[in-house]
Amino acid sequence: MKKTPLLNSSICEVVSKMGHTDMIAIGDSGLPIPDDTKRIDLALIKGVPTFMQTLKAVLLEQQVEEVIIAHETKEVSPETFENIKKEIGDVKITFISHEELKKELSNCKAVIRTGEQTPYANIILKSGVVF
């Protein structure tokens, strides 16, 4: 049995196959996911699981060197943005428009859909290296 806390086999599989600068996204329940991008749907009911619960779990498993966030997250959902900053520490933050973020999803290895109902609670995690 796994020793690390993350149990979701789909997320573990994607993260284990990621190389340097590969990307995975975590989104709220309304984020449109491109048909050709792997969807890991965790949404159970409204609000479950939350965006932050999911981000915390993925960060236990993945080395991240940069995150990509929409400008709108900071402007419309400042509490979510502050929580993200607390969780990622010194990781570089790149801001793009929400429309650009949606386009960037097609370059992600997977998009994790949560039950989150907060507007613009979306993030792209760019993989770092552990050495």
From Swiss-Prot:
GO terms for molecular function: D-ribose pyranase activity; intramolecular lyase activity; monosaccharide binding. Its main location: cytoplasm. Keywords: Carbohydrate metabolism, Cytoplasm, Isomerase. One of its GO terms (biological process) is D-ribose catabolic process. Disulfide bonds: none annotated. Substrate binds at D28, H98, Y120, A121, N122. It is found in: Cytoplasm. GO terms for cellular component: cytosol. It holds the Pfam family RbsD_FucU. The keyword tRNA processing does not apply. It is an enzyme of class 5 (isomerase). InterPro entries: D-ribose_pyranase, RbsD-like_sf, RbsD_FucU. Its EC number is 5.4.99.62. It catalyses: beta-D-ribopyranose = beta-D-ribofuranose. Pathway: Carbohydrate metabolism; D-ribose degradation; D-ribose 5-phosphate from beta-D-ribopyranose: step 1/2. The active site is at H20 (proton donor). Homodecamer. NCBIfam families: PRK11797.1. HAMAP family: D_rib_pyranase. Catalyzes the interconversion of beta-pyran and beta-furan forms of D-ribose. Belongs to the RbsD / FucU family. RbsD subfamily. This is D-ribose pyranase.
